């Protein structure tokens, strides 16, 4: 950051992903392109069009403050959102700064790593035009389908039997009269009639029951097409680049779609030999149809998407009654189970985002004005970032979730405006064997956000959607339930930075930097702090004693240390808010205002902390870069450890203060890890080459202190000596069996009601009582190892690529299987007297819940290796193409998300954290003129 260095002179830990690697496969955003390409960078995916996953660089260091990295696009730090709005084909390179010696120059904003995005710029030469485009067809693949209608009916029979075996037959002994009770209780005559089809011949035949594939109703073949046209050219004094892009991503779930338009332009002008100026603009307009919305439902705990809503409906339910009317609540009164027929047209969540990001600079080279000042330059740069976001939600009264009550609408907007102004002085000079670089920086930035939201029920006309909120009477709360809110937030950051880069004889390297940051979000007297860093490098390959070792091309040792800060709390965390409300005065309501003290407000508020300061991380990094056998083997390895102090935590305080909690600088964590990047060329002949890249990372974090010193915070599952994110609860030891009768009796004597087929919790203290004293740390939510592996095979223009990624050594909570007998159920192996080796407990019909410990079986050890992409392309011979005016041409086909080579949980896609994923095939074209 803030300058350019030769790779051989870099002393910090960083990784670079170039445009060629980024474009090995077409992606919707740069997050997808980065996955598995850089050691120490863990990226989760999202299949919803227009939605990105999350990214972590070297794990978590903070407990409650943000762990998101800083994004810098063409020198401009982004204050809102990430890089999802940027066209990946406009990106020249992505540099990831990982250690404190690299990120400390960004001060407070670099605590969680820095991602530098450099977009493409014009190059001197003839005008070059390029087109890139692709079409992708995707289908949803479910690793955990719902039970068929027949299987579900049998399963419910078992649930009734297990709830009352005296009065109900076994599940494998069908009884017509009992079925009339089991399936009439739901209150859906059509569903009962469907069940009775199985009794049409007087004996039970489950194959005659209509099996409704609800999931198939809401899915479709998703079609994505993206196109980018770009041009570049110029001469020695002026270079320009432009790009226009279009993306349309239709989801595999009906109602989900994302459309994005991109425009990018840059100009660089050598106005005078001593003055250069330029700028770039990156604009985007995106429209996301988020899909099925649960906003405005009577319960906020409904399904997260329409596919989940469909899977919640038992398959013995049917969509229509005998008269062809849609059945709103298939299978009856089951909570939060509604039809999905045409719901994608009755539940709208439309989100629009406009973003314009600029980067403008002017640079003076004083050495060109006066020779004695050779190497001295001054650069001023200004980067504005504007983002406007609008969300419109409309749920028709005819939708299943509104149950014919009232139309619901919501309209919300967010406007973000930020800017960064940098004044930078650089001095670079070589004195014999000494190479010196000095950078001085003064930087100021400001962030402002305005937001507004309004919602109401009983919108009189569906055509209004969210565009006529004034059509409701806001004073009639009972009828319209109208609500509105507005808000504004802003913060500022001022910084001063100095850095020295020194190299002696191209062998011994030194980088020293210091940054002084002041953040407006912290308390007076604590706003400013200093963040130093230093790094050493030794290019062993340049030593005289290495000259005769021809197989070593590069060998460099690195050591770095530095301190970074984190002030990622809300803008007014150190201040008390003013609360507004209405009080009766005579016959009218009069507005009144009070501080946020709980004496005046009913809500729980935090006590203002006028001493809130910086969260600081000190990191040490030990690294080696190497290249052997003329580059056939190359890579880097880094070992790091860090300590984070003065954590920004919500701390419980005595209630005699009138408050329950406050933000404070308390607690410590530490972090240790290893990053490995290995590039191999196992085979290289005249016509054939096989290249392989492996990126692996190990990471472990640990809590050292909390708000109350060395005392655990059990309510938040924070434990001294353990990872920041763990699962804490009761362990299970499989299922109780008939042979455990004597052991069960000891527990049941203390009030438990264990039976054969139920979950067997582990009694840690051996007192035959399962309570809070039996809870333990079950596992870590974050992976210990993250892996990326890509292989490319080239033969005379034919190119085959395979990409894999994986995570290892962590735990997921799959939720277990409640098996209450009334909700839908995925296909599982459940306990019966004839299936005692089942994976899950026996079903027990209950409106209040079946087996109280069913969730314990949801905790699973997680590890996977996923085949992310297989591509086959052909690069046409450039000599033959010149005859028809084409400089380059590539055709390719790709398969996306083929499946897993290994997964410890067979019914989940552990990469996504869901039971379903999209598998697709892409056909693409790249052509240059």
Explain the meaning of each model-derived region:
Residues 1-264, 272, 276-278, 282-284, ...:
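Short, small/polar-rich motifs associated with maturation and membrane association
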Residues 345-347, 475-497, 586-634, 662-685, ...:
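Outer-membrane beta-barrel signature, preferentially recognizing the C-terminal barrel domain
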Residues 140-142, 204-245, 249-256, 262-337, ...:
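Flexible loop and strand-edge segments within Gram-negative outer membrane beta-barrel domains
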Residues 220-236, 245-247, 340-391, 411-430, ...:
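Outer-membrane beta-barrel transmembrane strands
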Residues 251-262, 268-270, 282-284, 288-296, ...:
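Small-side-chain secondary-structure face that scaffolds active or pore-lining regions
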Residues 152-165, 184-209, 298-342, 395-409, ...:
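Surface-exposed loop/turn segments flanking beta-strands in extracellular/periplasmic regions
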């Amino acid at each position: 950051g803030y300058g350019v260095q030769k790779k051989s002179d870099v002393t910090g830990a960083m990784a670079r992903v170039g445009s060629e690697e980024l474009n090995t496969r077409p992606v919707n955003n740069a997050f997808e392109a980065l996955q598995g390409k850089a050691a120490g960078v863990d990226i989760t995916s999202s299949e919803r069009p227009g939605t990105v996953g999350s990214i972590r660089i070297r794990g978590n260091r903070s407990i409650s403050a943000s762990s998101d990295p800083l994004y810098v696009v063409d020198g401009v730090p982004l204050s809102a959102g990430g890089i999802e709005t940027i066209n990946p084909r406009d990106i020249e390179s992505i540099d990831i700064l990982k250690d404190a010696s690299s990120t400390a120059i960004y001060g407070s904003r670099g605590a969680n790593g820095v991602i530098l995005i450099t977009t493409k710029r014009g190059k001197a030469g003839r005008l070059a035009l390029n087109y890139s485009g692709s079409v992708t067809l995707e289908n949803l693949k479910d690793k955990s389908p719902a039970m068929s209608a027949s299987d579900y009916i049998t399963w419910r029979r078992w649930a009734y039997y297990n709830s009352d075996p005296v009065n109900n037959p076994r599940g494998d002994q069908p009884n017509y009269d009992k079925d009339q009770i089991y399936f009439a209780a739901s209150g859906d005559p059509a569903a009962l009639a469907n069940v009775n089809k199985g009794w049409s011949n007087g004996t039970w035949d489950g194959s005659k029951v209509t099996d409704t594939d609800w999931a198939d109703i809401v899915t479709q073949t998703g079609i994505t097409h993206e196109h980018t046209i770009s041009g570049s050219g110029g001469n020695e004094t002026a270079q320009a680049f432009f790009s226009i892009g279009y993306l349309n991503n239709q989801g595999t779930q009906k109602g989900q779609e994302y459309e994005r338009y991109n425009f990018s332009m840059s100009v660089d002008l050598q106005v005078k030999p001593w003055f250069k100026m330029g700028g770039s603009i990156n604009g985007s307009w995106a429209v996301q149809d988020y899909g099925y919305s649960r906003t405005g439902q009577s319960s906020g705990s409904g399904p997260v998407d329409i596919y989940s809503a469909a899977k919640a409906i038992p398959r013995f339910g049917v969509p229509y009654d005998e008269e062809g009317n849609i059945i709103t609540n298939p299978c009856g009164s089951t909570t939060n189970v509604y039809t999905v027929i045409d719901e994608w047209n009755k539940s709208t969540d439309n989100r629009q985002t406009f973003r314009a990001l600029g980067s403008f600079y002017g640079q003076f080279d004083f050495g060109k004005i006066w020779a004695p000042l050779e190497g001295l330059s001054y650069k001023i740069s200004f980067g504005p970032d504007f983002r406007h976001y609008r969300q419109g939600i409309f749920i028709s009264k005819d939708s299943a979730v509104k149950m014919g009550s009232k139309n619901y609408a919501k309209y919300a907007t967010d406007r973000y405006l930020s800017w960064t102004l940098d004044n930078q002085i650089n001095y670079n000079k070589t004195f014999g064997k000494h190479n010196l670089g000095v950078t001085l920086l003064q930087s100021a930035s400001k962030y402002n956000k305005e937001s507004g939201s309004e919602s109401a029920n009983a919108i009189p006309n569906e055509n209004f959607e969210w565009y006529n909120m004034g059509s409701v009477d806001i004073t009639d709360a009972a009828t319209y339930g109208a609500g509105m809110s507005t808000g504004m937030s802003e913060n500022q950051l001022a910084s001063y930075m100095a850095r020295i880069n020194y190299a002696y004889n191209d062998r011994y390297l030194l980088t020293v930097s210091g940054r002084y940051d002041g953040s407006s979000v912290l308390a007076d007297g604590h706003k400013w702090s200093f963040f130093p860093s230093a790094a050493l490098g030794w290019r062993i390959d340049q030593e005289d004693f290495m000259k005769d070792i021809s197989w070593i091309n590069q060998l460099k040792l690195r050591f770095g240390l530095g301190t970074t800060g984190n002030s990622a709390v809300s803008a007014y965390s150190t201040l008390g808010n003013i609360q507004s409300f209405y009080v009766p005065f005579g016959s009218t309501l009069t507005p009144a205002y009070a501080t946020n003290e709980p004496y005046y407000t009913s809500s729980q508020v935090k006590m203002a902390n006028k001493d809130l300061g910086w969260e600081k991380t000190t990191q040490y990094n030990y690294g080696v870069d190497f290249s052997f056998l003329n580059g056939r083997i190359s890579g880097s390895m880094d070992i790091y450890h860090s300590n984070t102090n003065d954590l920004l935590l919500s701390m419980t305080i005595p209630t005699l203060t009138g408050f329950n909690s406050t933000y404070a600088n308390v607690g410590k964590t530490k972090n240790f890890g290893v990053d490995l990047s290995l590039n191999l060329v196992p085979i290289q002949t005249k016509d054939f080459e096989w290249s392989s890249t492996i990126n692996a990372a190990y990471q472990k974090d640990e809590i050292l202190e909390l708000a109350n010193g060395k005392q655990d915070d059990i309510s938040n599952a924070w434990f001294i000596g353990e990872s920041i994110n763990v699962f804490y609860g009761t362990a299970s030891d499989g299922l109780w069996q008939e042979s455990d009768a004597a052991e069960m009796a000891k527990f049941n004597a203390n009030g438990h009601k264990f039976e054969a087929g139920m979950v067997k919790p582990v009694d840690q203290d051996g007192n035959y009582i399962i309570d809070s004293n039996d809870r333990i740390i079950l596992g870590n939510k974050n992976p210990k190892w993250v892996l990326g592996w890509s292989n490319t095979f080239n033969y005379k223009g034919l190119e085959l690529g395979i990409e894999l990624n994986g995570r290892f050594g962590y735990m997921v909570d799959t939720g277990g299987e409640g098996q209450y007998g009334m909700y839908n159920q995925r296909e599982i192996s459940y306990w019966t007297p004839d299936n005692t080796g089942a994976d899950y407990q026996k079903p027990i019909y209950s409106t209040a819940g079946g087996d109280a410990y069913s969730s314990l079986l949801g905790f699973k050890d997680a590890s996977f290796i996923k085949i992310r992409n297989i591509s086959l392309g052909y690069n046409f011979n450039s000599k033959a193409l010149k005859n028809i005016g084409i400089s380059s041409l590539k055709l390719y086909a790709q398969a996306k998300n083929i499946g897993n080579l290994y997964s410890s949980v067979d019914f989940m896609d552990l990469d996504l954290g869901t039971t379903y994923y999209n598998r697709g095939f892409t056909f693409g074209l790249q052509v240059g003129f």
